[in-house]
């Protein structure tokens, strides 16, 4: 039987942020389950980051290097830093069964807009201390 593929969209799991620590803890446990293949779409790092080599699961760096032609698009799009521009490319490459995210709604809402949304299960845990609370709360009522 084929392994279930899980993509975690997040701040790179080796950074020193709350989201990164949470992600590292979750992915390190999921990685140990033989039935799963896990990867992360790692925000705020580019392909030259040395930590990618030592990460035991797949890593798709979100940030282009300055020499890439996509760098100007990345710098010109405020939500590109959260994965907006690279998400669909990663979906096509990794083809996850499940996409997970634990950030603020405005950091992950592009995942709902993806043209590939019907092809993955979406497990999100948006924080509730963020703005805009009224709009976010309506999503779950």
Residue ranges and their predicted role:
Residues 1-49, 53, 94:
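N-terminal subdomain of nucleotide-sugar transferases
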Residues 54-141:
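Extended catalytic core of nucleotide-activated donor transferases of GT-like folds
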